[in-house]
């Protein structure tokens, strides 16, 4: 018992103690090393558990551009990851809002799919010389292993290289952005692969 | 036997403290938030910077911009001291804006982020409509930063004076 309390000082002292203990008789050694060994085993298990817990909530590192899959249509779009944008936005062609339903098509390059989605809000955009109101809809997409439901503003982005901009409203769901990389994750949600 | 078992346990435990699996990876890159205070060197002007992975290049709010041959003269916004600067132009950047194509002078700046100095290229433009006087884009972030949008102002700029 006395040896065990001394041991709490640290690893090196423990080693010295082990040497000293080995010189003592066998019966006494058994008595000492069993509780000490057990205590270490317990500590090891605890550490492993804590480590695993930390990994479960781990931040996902993504690059400056990532492929995402728009659900439930399974359209793959390259997305620009933009920490400078407060909200996300989607390239919507031939946009028309009727009775709070936004009607638009995805760019031809990505399948030209016609979509009808309820408008959940409007975003005021201040451009350099004019004011604009853009409809906001909710979409579901798969980025890496995560299925994300998020609000996006719709506008014609034909002059820009990426059909989807992922802004801070999505990135705050525990992603970190590393600009040296792109396409770090391939979309791997269960919903993407299952029929 | 018991002694060897304990030693084995100890060494396994020791290796956890010596080589924590996650820490080793995190050390390579500095995590910063969406807004960071930086110092413009050598003038030590403190500016809040928007960390913007959507911007290919960094840019600085330059007022009363005047180009004279290979140099450019401009003022920092009044809110940040209104310092008059004269810097050599190292290039031009063509930017597509809603009003058409714009040509912006590019200069090299030394900035202090956290405890480290960086020389980085920024283009100059009047950003009076925008909240932050400095945008740090991907050309700067590739120096070893990762961006966590859940955080902001993670560092205080404090660089030791150059020898």
State where each predicted segment sits.
Chain B
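Positively charged n-region of N-terminal signal peptides that target proteins for export
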Residues: 1-5
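Bacterial N-terminal signal peptides
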Residues: 7-18
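Pepsin/retropepsin-fold aspartyl endopeptidases
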Residues: 24-163
């Amino acid at each position: 018992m006395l040896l065990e309390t001394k041991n709490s000082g640290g690893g090196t002292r423990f080693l010295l103690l082990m040497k000293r203990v080995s010189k003592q008789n066998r019966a006494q050694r058994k008595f000492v090393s069993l509780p000490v060994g057990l205590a270490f085993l317990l500590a090891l298990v605890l550490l492993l558990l804590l480590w695993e817990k930390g990994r479960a909530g781990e931040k996902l590192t993504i690059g400056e551009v990532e492929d995402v899959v728009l659900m439930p249509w399974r359209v793959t779009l390259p997305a620009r990851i933009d920490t400078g944008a407060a909200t996300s936005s989607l390239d919507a062609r031939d946009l028309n809002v009727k009775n709070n339903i936004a009607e638009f098509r995805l760019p031809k390059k990505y399948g030209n799919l016609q979509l009808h989605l309820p408008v959940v809000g409007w975003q005021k955009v201040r451009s350099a010389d004019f004011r604009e109101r853009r409809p906001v809809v909710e979409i579901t997409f798969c980025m890496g292993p995560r299925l994300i439901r998020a609000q996006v503003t719709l506008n014609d982005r034909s002059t820009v290289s990426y059909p989807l901009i992922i802004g801070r409203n999505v990135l705050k769901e525990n992603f970190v952005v590393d600009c040296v990389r792109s396409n770090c994750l391939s979309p791997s949600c269960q919903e993407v692969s299952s029929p | 036997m018991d002694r060897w078992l304990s030693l084995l346990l100890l060494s396994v435990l020791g290796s956890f403290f010596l080589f924590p699996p996650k820490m080793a990876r995190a050390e390579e890159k500095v995590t910063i938030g969406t807004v960071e205070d930086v110092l413009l060197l050598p003038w030590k002007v403190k500016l809040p910077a928007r960390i913007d992975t959507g911007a290919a290049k960094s840019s600085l709010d330059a007022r009363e911009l005047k180009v004279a041959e290979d140099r450019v003269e401009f003022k920092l916004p009044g809110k940040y001291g209104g310092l008059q600067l004269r810097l050599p132009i190292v290039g031009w950047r063509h930017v597509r804006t809603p009003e058409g194509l714009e040509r912006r002078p590019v200069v090299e700046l030394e900035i202090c982020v956290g405890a480290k100095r960086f020389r980085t290229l920024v283009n100059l433009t009047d950003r009076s409509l925008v909240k932050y006087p400095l945008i740090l884009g991907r050309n700067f972030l590739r120096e070893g930063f990762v961006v966590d949008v859940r955080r902001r102002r993670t560092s205080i700029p404090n660089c030791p004076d150059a020898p």
